[in-house]
Amino acid sequence: EISACLVGSEMCIRDSTGGASNLTYLLRYPTRDLILRRPPAGTKAKGAHDMRREHDIQRALAPVFPAVAPMIAFCDDAGVIGSDFYVMERLDGIILRKNIPAELGLGEAEVRALCTAAIDQLVALHSIDVAGTELERFGKGEGYVKRQVDGWSARYRKARTHGVRHGTGSFEKVMAWLDEHQPHDVGNCLIHNDFRFDNLVLAHDDPTRVIGVLDWEMATLGDPLMDLGGALAYWVQADDDRIMRGSRRQPTHAPGMLTRDEVWQYYAHASGRAISPKDQL
């Protein structure tokens, strides 16, 4: 199947913009465009850059989530290009970066429609019933929130520099607060874990319509509100302070975009999930 895609006709290979972890290449043929994804070279963290898993999640999603790119094939023969890789169809559309291009001509109403369409994709993903499907194997079950808090605290302690004083003013206070205030899981569903505008593909003929969701390398089974919270962590709005605005990587500040409060309220209404004050911390 891989050979049928990659052999037999003239091809142009280009490094594709996007993908901050795994490497993404555009394979341009006379009659079609494909995308090849492979891990970076060098030493990799255990369990990271699992190309088979990333491929299999998207393949399993295809029957129940139309916004995933069709998978072509996975290859674990390192003799082909030096690593595992997979090939998928290219979703031809618009990917937003830091700002909305002026040439799209989107007014405030269209920007709001784009924003709610993005949240609708997250709601749709979290609404998938994974029980009894292939998707059920991509997670560890209940306890996702605790695993994240415990896991990241442990990584911090292993990575900190020896000989540096820790205590007052260190990250220990933050970790203690997170441990004390972590909410109970509200559900167990497939979560994307990197849901932001530069991982969405918009239709050329209607940029308020989402036709694709990309970069599934961190997807897993977990708490949907953790996925929502992760998305909001990137959500820099127009009235944020200078430091926050300086970290903005997507056009969430644009006139018409929902604020963070409006995002979680819209999500709660669309998903039917109650979000408590503790969940908002």
Model-found features: residue ranges?
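Short, small-residue-biased leader/transition segments that mark boundaries at the very start
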Residues: 2-12
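All-alpha amphipathic helical-bundle segments outside canonical DNA-binding/catalytic cores
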Residues: 139-140, 274-281
